[in-house]
Amino acid sequence: MASSDTEGKRVVVIGGGLVGALNACFLAKRNFQVDVYEAREDIRVANFMRGRSINLALSYRGRQALKAVGLEDQIVSKGVPMKARMIHSLSGKKSAIPYGNKSQYILSISREKLNKDLLTAVESYPNAKVHFGHKLSKCCPEEGILTMLGPNKVPRDITCDLIVGCDGAYSTVRAHLMKKPRFDYSQQYIPHGYMELTIPPKNGEYAMEPNCLHIWPRNAFMMIALPNMDKSFTCTLFMSFEEFEKLPTHSDVLDFFQKNFPDAIPLMGEQALMRDFFLLPAQPMISVKCSPFHLKSRCVLMGDAAHAIVPFFGQGMNAGFEDCLVFDELMDKFNNDLSVCLPEFSRFRIPDDHAISDLSMYNYIEMRAHVNSRWFLFQRLLDKFLHALMPSTFIPLYTMVAFTRIRYHEAVLRWHWQKKVINRGLFVLGSLVAIGSAYILVHHLSPRPLELLRSAWTGTSGHWNRSADISPRVPWSH
């Protein structure tokens, strides 16, 4: 993987989060001199901080990226397998919907622990270094010049061959690219926010089924719970900010949970629920799209800096990790030629990252509203049956996204085609059933339906036979 033509070339990665740290591993493995600049302090020694910590769902794409740098086994060993969605109805009834076949599962991963492991992996390379407490002040991407502010607040200019922007949804690197002509950008805050709650262990064990992603769908809002290695569950309540504002007091919160999530209260505990609910305000969720992802051969965006997505398909981290893997594959293909790799990365990756962004928006509606419907369950069973019957022709959308590396936009196209075929098949089947039912109904109501039809036809035929002077003419009768 490493190549002599990368030795001595310097890459600066802005952002030491998940994607930035993994990217640094890929680049260091290629013999680049890698410097990672992270605005926060080192989370491995920092005091516990709450905030942006929605549990992560690691699936096939992310695992393949980790595998490429030799980290898959280490990370997977610290995750909890989730084989199904466990749907909690308002009555307290629970029903499991498997994600795929018996061998397929996604992993619940702690964001904090994963980030710590990735930072440690970066520092294991002698040609890579992580600089904490350094904030990007100014960026000239065409020249590869950055101005950083360190802990002493003294500006320092840095020159490099490549700038990799992995600094999240509010990317400073992207803000500098937005000043360039022909750079498209859009962002959307969804009207819903999220709040993190906790279900502690019960008698030293999981309080619910551990190998499931638990969902309380309530149409306009929902709550989910992902298992942790310490036998607790991290719960996330997704709801519109207007609804959150209607819960200013402890009694309002308790009434709301008794009405909508009555089975969750004894699992959380009333006191713990109140403590967690008022610890932090609801956090916003943003979706970001931009194009292109690069500027010449000097700068490229990856992860949330390029395509922040809402978390409802569990693909934010996986898409970001796949960015790193795709870029690495392009570097192999084009011999580390940045002037070719960067534009090709934009061309190849933009349709996929925009597709998963749209799918994530769609999946929020499915998770909070559709999973309770009988039609949804019927579609899932039909998808499963057709996939078992024709595994290479019919592949469920979730399977394509979570358990393969089929490109995101191709998965969407294939999903639409499959839906069209299935809907036409159901229409034909429904028509045949309707015709058959009509025939049976007529046959049941009339004791001699066929004789009546036959006599009616005979009488009509006799009339035409007697009328010899009248003969129908058709084009082929000459």
From Swiss-Prot:
It comes from Rattus norvegicus. The keyword Oxidoreductase applies. The gene is Kmo. The keyword ATP-binding does not apply. This is Kynurenine 3-monooxygenase. FAD binds at V19, Y37, E38, A39, R40, A57, R111, L136, T172, D304, M317, N318. Keywords: FAD, Flavoprotein, Membrane, Mitochondrion, Mitochondrion outer membrane, Monooxygenase, NADP, Oxidoreductase, Pyridine nucleotide biosynthesis, Transmembrane, Transmembrane helix. GO terms for molecular function: FAD binding; flavin adenine dinucleotide binding; kynurenine 3-monooxygenase activity; NAD(P)H oxidase H2O2-forming activity. Belongs to the aromatic-ring hydroxylase family. KMO subfamily. It is an enzyme of class 1 (oxidoreductase). The chain crosses the membrane at residues 385-404, 425-445. Its cofactor is FAD. L-kynurenine binds at R85, Y99, N363, Y398. Catalyzes the hydroxylation of L-kynurenine (L-Kyn) to form 3-hydroxy-L-kynurenine (L-3OHKyn). Required for synthesis of quinolinic acid, a neurotoxic NMDA receptor antagonist and potential endogenous inhibitor of NMDA receptor signaling in axonal targeting, synaptogenesis and apoptosis during brain development. Quinolinic acid may also affect NMDA receptor signaling in pancreatic beta cells, osteoblasts, myocardial cells, and the gastrointestinal tract. It catalyses: L-kynurenine + NADPH + O2 + H(+) = 3-hydroxy-L-kynurenine + NADP(+) + H2O. Its EC number is 1.14.13.9.
